[in-house]
């Protein structure tokens, strides 16, 4: 009979192969030191080259061979040569490598007459400054008088000595420009196109106009140089309207002192209103 109380023999587990213990590699201090030495040496070399380069720069900058001797300024219409040199803040004897061209250009560009400036250095001793000046084509009255250039940009308040021999534009204020810059710029360009057309005419020329008034709701009204008679043009089609005026203007000149206005803003007629 089986002995139920007899313990069963435990199965023998298969012996696992034991891995040999890992052996720690010795630290290669010599390799680490070599790499560290290379990094430190490279940094030292870069630093030394930088210091040497700066030293060479100082020597070159200080040598009399690279001193400013010639200052070239492009031909000017309004500004004076010495004004540009004073704005640039340079003088003969300055070190050529110490000239900061961008800063010089920015200083010159602060003058309202300057629209564009180009500054160049030519070794061993020349500084060149090419200046493009703004040219006024009209005066705009916004409480104060300002010059207006061909792009429709208001660029300078008039001061004592400035010329006034330009057509005067009215009807556009500083508040208009601040509130609606794009619309105001468009209106000014429209007026400038009319001025350009008047300049090109052989009859009823720009000289016969003293003021050009712009009204956002109506358009353009001219005022004659003689007696200040309003000439209502409205908006657009200026060439045809002025052609019609030119045909009768010589006759009207004899009685211009009694005219209240001339209205050209019609397609088929001209209205001449007397006082």
UniProtKB/Swiss-Prot annotation:
Residues annotated as transmembrane: 39-61
Keywords recorded for this protein, A-Z: Cell cycle, Cell division, Cell inner membrane, Cell membrane, Membrane, Transmembrane, Transmembrane helix
Keyword Cytoplasm: no
Any GO CC annotation of this UniProt entry: plasma membrane
Location within or outside the cell: Cell inner membrane
Gene3D superfamilies the UniProt entry points to: Cell division protein FtsQ/DivIB, membrane protein fhac
Domain of life the protein comes from: Bacteria
Pfam family, one: POTRA_1
Region called Disordered, residue ranges: 1-20
Periplasmic membrane side: 62-275
Domain POTRA: 66-134
InterPro entries: Cell_div_FtsQ/DivIB_C, FtsQ, FtsQ_C_sf, POTRA, POTRA_FtsQ_type
Cytoplasmic side: 1-38
GO annotation, biological process: cell septum assembly; FtsZ-dependent cytokinesis
Function per UniProt: Essential cell division protein.
Name listed for the protein in its UniProt record: Cell division protein FtsQ
